[in-house]
Amino acid sequence: MIHCGICGSPKIPNVEFLCAHCINGSPSILLRDKLKLLLLRQEVEQLKHDVGEQLEAGFAGNGQFGKQLQKLDVYNEKRRLIKLRQRVQLVKNKIDVKRNRYQELERYLKDEDHFDKDKKVFDVEEIVNDEALTMSKLSQVLQRKQTALFKELCQWFRIEKCDEDVNNNNNVSAYTIWGVPMINLKYSNEMDRDKQVISMRYIHQFINFSFNIWLFEGISDVSIENEQNVIQNYSQLIYDTLRLLQVRKLVSESVSIRDILIRYDLDGMIYYLSKSKYLSSLDDASNSYPPTLQNIKQLVASMIPSI
């Protein structure tokens, strides 16, 4: 008979057998295993804490890992936007085909030499009306897709307005993009140069993607590599932002560029664009100072003369 090593003497030397009762209730075994379990839990918690700190540091964008993740995010978003733009372009092509057909039928309808009977006129008018209705529906589909895609883009870039307390403490910008304060003319000299370049690049990417969504060209394909030509960078971003605002009908066609820059600055223009809010400003009724790139450069140079 084999005896338990705790409540009895083992029959086989150097071999300890434990009965079920002692395994479940012996203080010496329970305490030892419980201490081991507590130590193991402490090690696991410490490992979790260390791993969490490493991940936070990596995802924060300060380290190499964070920078690579940001590049990967931009690459993935570009691929997704290219696919979506292709779909939007297909809808636009259908609209163009319908529009051309509509115009052709209108011309045919106005040419009285083609008609011998009233029935023929009625048939052509019916076709024209059907084509016009189809084109209107396709235009609505295109607009809905563009609006939804632009909304996703604004959410992805996290264009937000800072709290008043945070804004008063920073004294840089009231708005952020991807967690970085947005550049503006008012506080251009108070912002760190490295952050200024990062902010410019984020805004440049946002504008470039926006051009793809709304299907028209800008000068945003000119890359922003450094802070050497600040006036050129500011002017380029302001010019393209103003074009987007005009396409979205968020500013007057005869807007005064000086007045809108004084009221909103570049960061405010980007924020209002992301929220699809109308920017009220004075009009340049005489069109004496049109919003050309050259005029914007002169304005930027006069508003930040110390650069």
Swiss-Prot record:
Keywords (A to Z) from UniProt: Autophagy, Coiled coil, Membrane, Protein transport, Transport, Vacuole
Record lineage: Eukaryota, Fungi, Dikarya, Ascomycota, Saccharomycotina
Location of the region described as Cysteine repeats in the Swiss-Prot/TrEMBL record: 4-22
Coiled-coil residues: 36-113
Cellular localisation: Preautophagosomal structure membrane; Vacuole membrane
Domain of life: Eukaryota
Membrane topology value: Peripheral membrane protein
InterPro entries: Autophagy-related_protein_14 (IPR023261), UV_resistance/autophagy_Atg14 (IPR018791)
Entry GO CC: phagophore assembly site membrane; protein-containing complex; vacuolar membrane
Protein name, as recorded: Autophagy-related protein 14
Task performed by this protein: Required for cytoplasm to vacuole transport (Cvt) and autophagy as a part of the autophagy-specific VPS34 PI3-kinase complex I. This complex is essential to recruit the ATG8-phosphatidylinositol conjugate and the ATG12-ATG5 conjugate to the pre-autophagosomal structure. ATG14 mediates the specific binding of the VPS34 PI3-kinase complex I to the preautophagosomal structure (PAS).
Family note: Belongs to the ATG14 family.
